[in-house]
């Protein structure tokens, strides 16, 4: 990813490199203006991709093909969750694939995901 690159919404713009990181995808279509260091709320620094919105949204508001996740084995399902950058939104945004990996030793008949973790209005 470099300044001047065109991105589509949903395109991978940052790949997880460490155990507690997650893949990051572009929220909008546009042109990468710069990659710069930013300060996170907890005081850490990280690189950020600054995107100037330009072009058409080709995913937002459209029905996308469903993943046939029901036929995936546990390892493939964890890989899909990791590739999509799913993280918990609690106090510490832990990558969901890491949390699920911890419970892989036992057999799981039902998996319940709280899609609104820490939401005060629910």
Give short role names for the model-derived ranges:
Residues 2-15, 34:
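Short, well-structured beta-strand-loop connectors
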Residues 1, 18-21:
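Short, solvent-exposed loop/turn positions at domain surfaces
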Residues 21-122:
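Iron-sulfur-associated redox domains of electron-transfer enzymes in respiratory
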């Amino acid at each position: 990813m470099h300044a001047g690159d065109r991105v589509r919404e949903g395109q991978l713009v940052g790949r997880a490199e460490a155990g507690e990181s997650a893949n990051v995808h572009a929220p909008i279509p546009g042109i990468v203006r710069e990659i710069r260091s930013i300060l996170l709320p907890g005081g850490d620094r990280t690189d950020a991709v600054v995107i100037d919105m330009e072009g058409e949204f080709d995913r937002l508001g459209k029905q996308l093909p469903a993943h046939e996740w029901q036929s995936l084995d546990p390892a493939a399902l964890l890989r899909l969750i990791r590739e999509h950058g799913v993280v918990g939104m609690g106090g510490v945004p832990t990558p969901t694939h890491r949390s699920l990996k911890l419970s892989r030793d036992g057999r799981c008949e039902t998996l319940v995901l709280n899609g609104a973790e820490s939401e005060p209005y629910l």
